[in-house]
Swiss-Prot record:
Residues in coiled coil: none
This protein's UniProt keywords: Capsid protein, Virion
Cellular localization per UniProt: Virion
Organism: Pseudomonas phage KPP25
Keyword Transcription regulation found: no
Descriptive protein name: Major capsid protein
Role description: Assembles to form an icosahedral capsid.
């Protein structure tokens, strides 16, 4: 990623440890703030993306662990019957998030190129590398939620020579489980479980009816929501821009926004802001998995010609994010100090938690996310 640059290089590659720490923290703050997933991070179980910042030490060593607590299955005792000896042990599932290092670097063309530029190399590199890391974290997070291999981009196209499939945590990406993999049948207005993308038709576009049915489905499957103001359960829903456009054109969706919000420019129907419908916070994001980058015949539908989107319905602990330590900032000189380079490195990991659900006869299911295949 060569950049035309200029600046005072008398101290290049000679920063003190304290100065490196400052640049590293500035870089990470900028990357974190630019990442879309940052809005959904939290350190406890009432977070859509639970952020693990410390390693847990046990007999197996230091590991990044996310803990899922299953609901109790017993009914206790009644009256004066003996409770002691009839206690129910809490069932906890400790799931390890594998860690790996992501690195990238910039190098400029040389001192003569510096003289032709007014851009400071160190500052520009920080900005460019921060955006790179933020964007790649977003991509990996949404591929993990969709259960799609890192060998693909979020538009369904192959990455080519990308190293992402070699990330340690890439091996833990799992397809959506049977009862968390749905198709919206737009003709009959029903959700179809254990769905296949080949069954998607052009009529299966997002609608208000889908949102209502999906929330009801999640409640019956005990997908735990996020506690909002007043203790109300909230969920996050994600669509790519074209799927969101189809939802915005649904007459029932339009009618509910018109009647449910204040009229005028503050109405999200006109303002284009984030919409909350029946406890569902609706988000539009370009990295929600879709088929835009696939060749005709390889998309969805019986003939492979239907463009689609894997709409995400997320509750608590939908994703685990291991965020271990500050990034590393390294400056280096090349070619007899004629060229300069900057690299950054961050240790992290993603995991979509799964657990044996007592509500699905003990079958392993995705813990906090439902994928819904829709036409877009």
């Amino acid at each position: 990623m060569p950049l035309p640059v200029q600046g005072n290089y008398t101290n290049f590659a000679r920063l003190t440890n304290e100065q490196k720490t400052v640049w590293s923290l500035q870089f990470w703050r900028q990357a974190r703030n630019a990442a879309f997933i940052n809005m959904f991070l939290g350190t406890d179980a009432n977070s859509m993306i639970q952020q693990i910042t410390e390693l847990r030490r046990d007999e197996k060593g230091a590991r990044a662990v996310i803990t899922l607590i299953a609901d109790m299955v017993g009914d206790g005792v009644v009256g004066d019957n003996q409770l002691e000896g009839n206690e129910e042990a809490l069932t906890a599932f400790d799931t390890v998030i594998q860690l790996d290092q992501m690195r990238a670097a910039n190098v400029h063309e040389g001192r003569m190129a510096d003289q032709r530029s007014i851009v400071n190399f160190r500052t520009t590199s920080r900005d460019m590398l921060a955006y790179w890391l933020a964007d790649r974290m977003d991509q990996l997070a949404f591929l993990s939620l969709a259960g799609v291999s890192y060998a693909y981009r979020t538009n369904g196209a192959l990455r080519g020579s990308s190293p992402f499939p070699n990330l340690t945590f890439a091996a833990d990406v799992t397809p959506p489980s049977a009862n968390r993999r749905l198709r919206w049948d737009g003709t009959n207005k029903v959700l179809v479980p254990n769905a296949a993308t080949s069954d998607v038709t052009a009529a299966d576009t997002p609608s208000y009816a889908l949102l209502v049915n999906l929330k009801a489905y999640a409640k019956t499957k005990y997908i735990r929501g996020l506690r909002g103001d007043g203790g109300e359960e909230m969920y996050h829903v994600f669509l790519d821009p074209l799927a969101m456009a189809k939802l915005k054109l649904d007459p029932d969706y339009i009618a509910n926004l018109r009647s449910g919000y204040t009229r005028g420019n503050v109405n999200p129907l006109f303002k284009g802001g984030i919409v909350t419908v029946d406890g569902l916070v609706i988000h539009e994001f370009r990295h929600v998995y879709n088929t835009r980058g696939m060749a005709p015949g390889a998309k969805w539908g019986a003939s492979g010609n239907v463009d689609g989107c894997s709409m995400l319905f997320c509750g608590a602990q939908a994703l685990g994010f291991a965020d271990i330590g500050n990034p590393r900032w390294v400056e280096k000189e090349f070619d007899y100090d004629n060229k300069h380079g900057i690299s950054v490195a961050k240790i992290l990991g993603f995991l979509k938690p799964q657990f044996p659900s007592i509500y699905e006869d003990g079958n392993t299911e995705d813990f906090g996310v439902i994928n819904v295949y829709v036409a877009a």
